[in-house]
């Protein structure tokens, strides 16, 4: 049987380089990925290297608040 709370939560990863450069969100947009993480194994914010189609390279994508 399942335990009380679900450990897996859905998180959104956003390109930190696009945000830092101040890209206009309406016209160009910011690269975002949706993934899941286990709250018990990784309680801190998640950071992964993913491909950013706006920057045309692999950059660090950090977890943002919903």
From Swiss-Prot:
GO terms for molecular function: structural constituent of ribosome. GO terms for biological process: translation. The keyword Ribonucleoprotein applies. It is found in: Plastid, Chloroplast. It comes from the Eukaryota. Keywords: Chloroplast, Plastid, Ribonucleoprotein, Ribosomal protein. One of its GO terms (cellular component) is chloroplast. Belongs to the bacterial ribosomal protein bL33 family. This is Large ribosomal subunit protein bL33c. It comes from Cucumis sativus (Cucumber).
